[in-house]
Amino acid sequence: MNVGSILNDEPSPSKKTTNDDSGDSVRPDMSTYQRHSLVNLLNDPAPNNELKTKETKKDWSEDEHSNFRVPVTEPNQQLSPVLRRSSIADITNEKDVDISSSTEHPIEQDKSEKDEDELTRISKLKSTNKPRRYTEPPIWAQEWIPTSYQGTANGTPVVNAQESSLSSKRVFDRSSTVNVDLECSITGVIPPPSVTRTIAEWIYANFTEIPDDQRKYVELELKFGTIIDKRAGHRIDINVSTECIFTDNSNTYFDMGVHEVGWNDMCKFLDDLEKSYQDELRRSPQANSNSPKRKFNILESDITDNFYQITSRNEQPKSIRISKDNLLDPPRYTAINKQRLSSLFIHNPSSMYDLRLSLSYENPIADNNIDGIIKKNQPTLTRIKKRNSWTHRPTVTRFDMTRVLSPRESKNKSGKKIVEQDQSFEVELEVDTLELFNGFDKFKSGADSIRFEELVEIFVNNARCLNNRVTKLANK
């Protein structure tokens, strides 16, 4: 006698009926809810109404695919489905799917309400949790804004309407070296030169003060000369041997100009670069078919500048420069009001000359006001400039090599007035401010954090090339 027989209240083997040897004895029909084994113990107890239904059944038909008997009901009679859990699979049936018919009963819970509850819970979690990033950077991480621009909408840069004509390809590869067995640094990045970084920061700080509508009038130029100590009367000596930024402007001044020998040698240096470029084009025309025909765009000019000091009521005095183009007949007059914004001295004791980086406004004067200024005022200074300009587009630089004649009046022994011409030589490098402002905007917007400093380094490198050239000449 097994456990199933005990649970089903079967009689002991001694109480069984005879005819065992025939094997044809039939047991009475058992309800589908009788517990035949331990597995059936897992099933729910049979409802009373289902047991009563069995008594009202009329006909039975035998299923052709199984030994179970399927009850046949009346056409209009419907039986409630009975879910049986006869296996572990049925027990873990979370959706209450009838295995025999594979039908799924609808879930009473409204899914839309459940989704809304989930969204509400997620929104609450987002509002209570700490954000991953600051909506506003802490004070130590915020960008410095000048006092004049605080409280304005200058935080978002306005990109210049005129796009750059240069590509965004990197000029200086600061992450690799030529030799495969060497690395540029322990971090894999070459640190920027300290002098170049300081110059770029100085330009950046001044550019933030310039309104967008005034950008087209900005001029940024490097001039060759020497930093003179006012007390000693000669070039400064601050016990340094390399290039540096000199900030003590109170006791010094910048003596602009170069020697004639050095000026001629720098002009020859630019001419030699142009000749070498032309020779390279002739040697390999096919390889350089897409290259420009000239390395530099060279322009000669002959300009006479007259400076006027204009004073108006309730206004500060203005220095007006009226330029006369002597190469045109009749000559053409243009006038500007030049205002210097800031200057930076770059001292290099190992080179022949120092540099002064000047940032200025060049506001144009209307042509109809020029005649009135000339007739009503006397010039305070006259300069005749015979200039050769080399414009090198790939380095966004224009080289101005100028021979300046300054008329000087004097009297001879007999008292007769004599006009003499003092001659001087000047070297200026002017950067394309449009390209520099484009790099400035890209840096502020985060689109390109390298372009701005890269342009500054290119510009300063051009000045270093000329300075090194004339220094070699002096050391011979």
Swiss-Prot record:
Record family assignment: Belongs to the fungal TPase family.
Taxonomy of the source species: Eukaryota, Fungi, Dikarya, Ascomycota, Saccharomycotina
Any single GO CC term annotated in Swiss-Prot or TrEMBL for this entry: mRNA capping enzyme complex
Record's keyword annotation contains Hydrolase: yes
Stored PANTHER family: POLYNUCLEOTIDE 5'-TRIPHOSPHATASE CTL1-RELATED, POLYNUCLEOTIDE 5'-TRIPHOSPHATASE-RELATED
Enzyme class, broadest EC rank: hydrolase
Keywords from the UniProt entry: Hydrolase, mRNA capping, mRNA processing, Nucleus
Function: First step of mRNA capping. Converts the 5'-triphosphate end of a nascent mRNA chain into a diphosphate end.
Main localization of the protein described in the UniProt heading: nucleus
Keyword check for Nucleus: yes
Protein name stated in the entry: mRNA-capping enzyme subunit beta
Pfam families membership: mRNA_triPase
Assembly and interaction partners: Heterodimer. The mRNA-capping enzyme is composed of two separate chains alpha and beta, respectively a mRNA guanylyltransferase and an mRNA 5'-triphosphate monophosphatase.
Single Gene Ontology MF annotation: mRNA 5'-triphosphate monophosphatase activity
Gene name of the encoded protein: CET1
Catalysis: reaction(s): a 5'-end triphospho-ribonucleoside in mRNA + H2O = a 5'-end diphospho-ribonucleoside in mRNA + phosphate + H(+)
Superkingdom field: Eukaryota
